Amino acid sequence: MDLNNYIASIENYPQEGITFRDISPLMADGKAYSYAVREIVQYAADKDIDMIVGPEARGFIVGCPVAYALGIGFAPVRKPGKLPREVISANYEKEYGLDTLTMHADAIKPGQRVLIVDDLLATGGTVKATIEMIEKLGGVVAGCAFLVELDGLNGRKAIEGYDTKVLMNFPG
């Protein structure tokens, strides 16, 4: 199945000169959504994964069905103030400054093998901060899986050395 047909490209959104890659059409089509989830599940199958971690919000949309299919747990990564218990945090660079991500301090147990799942790999800032938190908790990042990679934004460089699966590539 050619998943590229299920990604909408919106020019000049959220600002002039940016092309936003919208996964909503993929999610709206049951066959395409199921296919994408199965592709990530297949990627994870031989990695002995204990936990899926997904950054908000679209990492939840992709990561939760993968966790369900594998019969394992899901741990959310959120912006500050969104998680109710003790958290750890990591900062990352955005185009216009620093931002912060958090996860529960007990979300990952030492030695757990983790697959990070998100919708999009662009600059790699979000996934790099997520990796930092998982490793701070003693987890092992067994891989990273994305629906879309924006080529030319150097996201792969940010996660060099980590096994990565991407289902679709688009210009950045």
Swiss-Prot record:
GO cellular component: cytoplasm
InterPro entries: Ade_phspho_trans, PRibTrfase_dom, PRTase-like, UPRTase/APRTase
Reactions accelerated catalytically: AMP + diphosphate = 5-phospho-alpha-D-ribose 1-diphosphate + adenine
Places the protein is found: Cytoplasm
Taxonomic superkingdom: Bacteria
GO molecular function annotation: adenine binding; adenine phosphoribosyltransferase activity; AMP binding
Keyword terms, alphabetized: Cytoplasm, Glycosyltransferase, Purine salvage, Transferase
Pfam families referenced in this protein's UniProt entry, alphabetically: Pribosyltran
NCBIfam families registered for this protein in UniProt: apt (TIGR01090), PRK02304.1-2 (NF002633), PRK02304.1-3 (NF002634), PRK02304.1-5 (NF002636)
Function: Catalyzes a salvage reaction resulting in the formation of AMP, that is energically less costly than de novo synthesis.
Family: Belongs to the purine/pyrimidine phosphoribosyltransferase family.
UniProt-recorded name of the protein: Adenine phosphoribosyltransferase
Organism: Streptococcus agalactiae serotype Ia (strain ATCC 27591 / A909 / CDC SS700)
Gene from which this protein is expressed: apt
